[in-house]
Structures are given as C-alpha cells and as structure tokens.
Amino acid sequence: MDHLPIFCQLRDRDCLIVGGGDVAERKARLLLDAGARLTVNALAFIPQFTAWADAGMLTLVEGPFDESLLDTCWLAIAATDDDALNQRVSEAAEARRIFCNVVDAPKAASFIMPSIIDRSPLMVAVSSGGTSPVLARLLREKLESLLPLHLGQVAKYAGQLRGRVKQQFATMGERRRFWEKLFVNDRLAQSLANNDQKAITETTEQLINEPLDHRGEVVLVGAGPGDAGLLTLKGLQQIQQADVVVYDRLVSDDIMNLVRRDADRVFVGKRAGYHCVPQEEINQILLREAQKGKRVVRLKGGDPFIFGRGGEELETLCNAGIPFSVVPGITAASGCSAYSGIPLTHRDYAQSVRLITGHLKTGGELDWENLAAEKQTLVFYMGLNQAATIQQKLIEHDMPGEMPVAIVENGTAVTQRVIDGTLTQLGKLAQQMNSPSLIIIGRVVGLRDKLNWFSNH
C-alpha cells in the first residue's frame, strides 16, 4: 500500500492553496466544503476567488509565494502552472512537516487527493495512487450510481438512534438485523428527504417495535427494454439488495449479472401463447418467498405496469397483506423507438401515441376505426404473430396501405434488428423477425432514415 487513506478534520484549521486559476478553484471548493480556514496565494485570481473573499469565505494574498504563509498551516496545496514554484511550495511544506498536495505531480506530493463520493456523513474516497486519475473518476461515477442520494440523511439519522437501538435490542445479531431493515426502508428515506417528521417518527417506531422475523416484502422492478445501461439507478439498488430475484425471459443476461451474487434466482420465463410458469404460480412464488421474511425483487422486462401483469401480482400481495413497492422501468416503446431513430411523437406527424397489446383474444376486438386515424403512432407489443391480422384490420378501416411501419427485434440490445416498410407489407415483414419484437406504425417511421443513430455506432 503506497498511500494510507485517512479522513482529515480540517474545520477551522488553517490551510493554504498556492494558485489562483481553475485548478486551484476546484481544490478550494473541497477545502471550503470541509470547513477549512483557507488562505489563497497567487499573482492573480479568477473571479470566483474574489467572490469568495468578498463573502468572507477565504483570505486572498496577492503577490509572490512567501514561505511564511505556511507557518500556521495544517495542510497545503500547490496548484499553479509553474512546476518550479509548485516544487518550492512542496519543499517548504516538507521542511515544516506539513502535508502538501502538488497538482498533477504525485511524486512531488506528500498526499494525493482522491475522487470523492459525498453522502455526508458517509464519505467514500477512490484513488489510483496518482497513476490513473481517469480510472479513479470512472470508478467514482460507478459508485455514485450505486449509492442513493439520500444515504447521508439516513446515516445521520442512524447516528441519532444508536443509543435507543442498543437499549431495545440485546444482541449484536438483533441490532444488525434492525440496521439492515432501516437502511433499505424506502419510506424512511423519502420521509427524511422531505423532512416529514410525522412520517419519520411513525416509520421509526414501526421498525423498532415490529418483530425481527417479520414478513418480507416484494419490490416490482422494471428492467427496461434490454440495454443494461437503461436500468434505473433505483432498480439497480433494489436488485443488489434482494434475497430472491424472480425474473422472466425479457430480462437480459447483462442485467442479471448485476444481481447480488448470493441472491436466489427464480426463472419464470414466458413466451407469447405459452407460459413456462402459469401466472397464478408466479403470484404464489412471490407470496411464499415474502412470507419467509425475504426481500423479493420481481424483475420484469420493460415497465412492469405496461403489459407486464404487474398489477395482478401486486393484487395477490395486497390481499395477503405483504408490503410492496414499485420501481418503474423504461418501457419497450420508448427504448425501441429511440434506438431505432423513430420519435413516437412529432409536431408534424403524430400528436398522440397508442400502446396496444398484440395478444388479440377472441371477444376482445380492438377499436380499429380509431386506431386507423391519422396523426398518431401505434405501438403493438407482442404482436408478431398477429401482424397479418393487424395489417388487414387497419386497411379495412381506411388506414392508407403506404403507411410506414417498422418492426424492432431485440430492441436496444447489441443484437437489435430493425426492418421497415409499408402497412401492406407488415404481415410478410413479420415472418422475417423473431420474438421479442415490437411493431411501430405511423408517419414518424419515415424519419428513421434520417434519425437512425444506433445502427451507425
């Protein structure tokens, strides 16, 4: 280990930055956030430093560097574009046993600045030891996505509860289980974010007083249309906290690779016209796992409330008194259209969008007359096997045969395939495609040649 990671208490302690440009300004922000009593020395300063000085937030010393500026300092930063001056600052600090950071010169520095994820009081620092700042930044960005923005408020509140929790729960195991419940409780986090004292008190009392072997909960999570990058941050957080993940065929392998490693995985894949696991059995799986006290994630492709039967599953849980929540996902219509260069609405071509299930059941005739109207976009989910019927019905109700259509297979994935044509060709086009596919019908499809960005990558 070349560097020891430490967190310094700098509040009301003298610190010095030598340099008055943009780089020095970024370092100054960090020290000001930490409450340091900051002096900045340079021949000239960018306007931000002047504004801070006018507000009484720091002291400016205009002129050449004077080593006496270090006499009362706990920490120094050399942030000029003059390598010789930076080296002089570093040597003067070293002689006084003051830690000094030299920007872009880690070998000349006695400490380096990490990439920081700030969820105060929770802090995470990432460093590559100065060898690859870009790598450290990328890791920080990834960690940022994993740590909810409200986490700091929850951590601060947990500190206030420590005494009571110690009195309430006799063993370390009981306390650990309580803290695990508290840190994943979305209602408490939201209440803290909203400063809703009544809800904070109610939720805290419920968590403290309920038995530790309480029933579990189910979180319905939309996995998006395929590209793992389209999974929401909250969806990612939920699948990494799950004890059990119940997932279907439309959830990509890339997304399943993000699931917590020791979570149980239950596959309940479905295909149009055939159910690997009957819906009622899926409902019972969710119920059974939650009743064991487990945190269950029901992971569905797209958005669970758009042709995902999410409402049916939640009704079962509601009737059994099982707590549940929902994390929306990007629905296939949005993802597939965007990755195909087809805007669902357009000022000149479509003022509305219809999302329609392609599972056309006997006795469930659609309103084809309204669907055939102009100035709208039709998106058929699971309509591949019914493409010829869709073509026939729309033409019978006076939709022009030259109306542009597109079929998107494996939308947003690297294996995405799109074919387009006209309504009179829809049935034949569908024979060339495989499930999962989405059918888009409307004038907006004509913009695909101009706006198709994804296939050009």
UniProtKB/Swiss-Prot annotation:
CDD domains: SUMT. Pathway: Cofactor biosynthesis; adenosylcobalamin biosynthesis; precorrin-2 from uroporphyrinogen III: step 1/1; Cofactor biosynthesis; adenosylcobalamin biosynthesis; sirohydrochlorin from precorrin-2: step 1/1; Porphyrin-containing compound metabolism; siroheme biosynthesis; precorrin-2 from uroporphyrinogen III: step 1/1; Porphyrin-containing compound metabolism; siroheme biosynthesis; siroheme from sirohydrochlorin: step 1/1. It catalyses: uroporphyrinogen III + 2 S-adenosyl-L-methionine = precorrin-2 + 2 S-adenosyl-L-homocysteine + H(+); precorrin-2 + NAD(+) = sirohydrochlorin + NADH + 2 H(+); siroheme + 2 H(+) = sirohydrochlorin + Fe(2+). Residues 216-457 are annotated as: Uroporphyrinogen-III C-methyltransferase. GO terms for molecular function: NAD binding; precorrin-2 dehydrogenase activity; sirohydrochlorin ferrochelatase activity; uroporphyrin-III C-methyltransferase activity. NAD(+) binds at residues 22-23, 43-44. S-adenosyl-L-methionine binds at residues 225, 301-303, 306, 331-332, 382, 411. GO terms for biological process: cobalamin biosynthetic process; methylation; siroheme biosynthetic process. Residues 1-204 are annotated as: Precorrin-2 dehydrogenase /sirohydrochlorin ferrochelatase. HAMAP family: Siroheme_synth (MF_01646). This is Siroheme synthase. It comes from Shigella dysenteriae serotype 1 (strain Sd197).
